[in-house]
Regions:
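Active-site anion-handling motifs in enzyme catalytic cores
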Residues: 1-395
Length: 395
């Protein structure tokens, strides 16, 4: 059993903005490792904030944002080389602290968050570099909770493949990611998202009450759809949901300000625009933290979401879900999250008020069967996830 791991996800609250999903995956990792007496050191965009939030030591990322591919490739080479020759880096280079942190731990975990696709190539370089540092220092690497691609160009595959092939374990969330991992030369474990059970066994959790409300969590990532068109279509879909279910509508931003009194930012901006176009009344719940977000999703009667982690939280509880997608990436993620629990209610954002309405009616009609399917799958999914965390802790 390992004693202390360094973990990189995509954490760190910057400018007062919380990203529920990314923080949730790290929080779940911290909880699972703590139950196995394994400590963590976090790699974060905001080390002081993350250290305070999670009660673990934190260091800053190596740093690849804004670099050209040539510059990123050279920086990766220099940093990995510096794992054995520290003098290769400037004295104030943040990579020095990362190298020291890896040297002071028993292994590295590449956690969920910062999905590995060419649209975010800085994440690819960051994680491949961390794996390279671990290899140079003789530390094992485990990869968990990943979505791969679907856009992963040959150059990024060449960066990522050696890191994946050197890892002792690789875990992904969707069958499409599993297939892409195989193309990279790795047989990956396919399982539920790492945050699927976040906080669901906390002592203050009470699931005895009836589920209430139409929960709406949208994303400002609209693909090729123009904003006014998206707002109009979403408003019609949500109005239909309110009329169909007879439930109150609640909006909850998964990317929004930590301060509940702050002006709307992130997803909350889109939420306000949609609310203005709706006929049904609605309320807003502040972004809050991952555990509160998970409880909210699990207690809802229906979820309409353009975000991924609301579905991750709600599906295990058997909440009927309408997942809205804007491209292949979001479609793969939504279908992947739902498939683990026997759901498939996904529609394109551009057809939210047509195909989305049909999906809404179907999942609401089938809500009893959806709940039963989740309940039937829970024991196996939970046991498999627990066994996976055991393997991660062993390295």
């Amino acid at each position: 059993m390992l004693v202390r791991l360094l973990s990189i996800g995509d954490i760190g609250v910057l400018d007062g903005m919380m990203h529920i999903g990314d923080e949730a995956m790290f929080e779940a990792l911290r909880d699972e490792m703590a139950m196995r007496d394994v400590g963590l050191v976090a790699v974060s965009s905001a080390p002081t904030e993350s250290a305070d939030r999670y009660g673990v030591p934190s260091v800053r990322n190596v740093g690849f944002r804004g670099l050209s591919r040539a510059a990123a490739t050279e920086r990766m080479r220099l940093v990995i080389d510096a794992a054995k020759r520290p003098s290769a880096l400037e004295t104030d280079d943040p990579a020095r602290e990362v190298i020291d942190a890896v040297a002071g731990t028993d292994g590295v975990v590449v956690a969920g968050g910062g999905n590995l696709a060419s649209r975010w190539s800085a994440h690819v370089f960051e994680r491949a570099t961390l794996a390279g540092i671990a290899g140079a220092l003789g530390r094992p690497v485990v990869v968990t909770g990943q979505t791969l691609g679907p856009d992963l160009d040959p150059e990024d595959r060449a960066v990522l493949s050696p890191a994946f092939r050197a890892a002792r374990l690789v875990g992904v969330r969707e069958s499409a990611s599993c297939a892409l991992a195989r193309e990279l030369g790795v047989e990956a474990r396919l399982g539920v998202d790492d945050a699927s059970f976040l906080g669901d066994r906390d002592s203050d959790v009470d699931e005895s009450g009836a589920r209430r409300g139409v929960l709406v969590s949208l994303s400002l990532s609209l693909g090729d759809l123009r904003r006014p068109q998206a707002v109009a279509r979403l408003a019609r879909l949500i109005d239909e949901a309110a009329a169909l279910t007879g439930e109150a509508v609640v909006f909850h931003a998964h990317f929004g300000p930590l301060d509940p009194g702050a002006p709307p930012r992130g997803d909350a901006i889109l939420h306000d625009e949609v609310r203005e176009r709706m006929s049904a009344r609605s309320e807003v719940i502040p972004t809050g933290d991952p555990r509160a977000a998970a409880r909210l999703a699990r207690s809802s009667a229906l979820l309409i979401t353009g975000r991924y982690h609301p579905a991750v939280f709600a599906a295990p509880a058997g909440v009927p879900i309408v997942g809205l997608t804007s491209d292949d990436y979001t479609r793969i993620k939504q279908l992947g999250a739902l498939a683990h629990w026997g759901q498939d209610g996904v529609a394109a954002l551009g057809a939210a008020d047509t195909d989305g309405t049909a999906t809404l009616r179907r999942v609401w009609h089938d809500r009893a069967a959806i709940s039963a399917a989740a309940e039937a799958r829970m024991p196996a999914n939970r046991a498999e996830a627990s066994a996976w965390w055991d393997s991660v802790a062993r390295g």
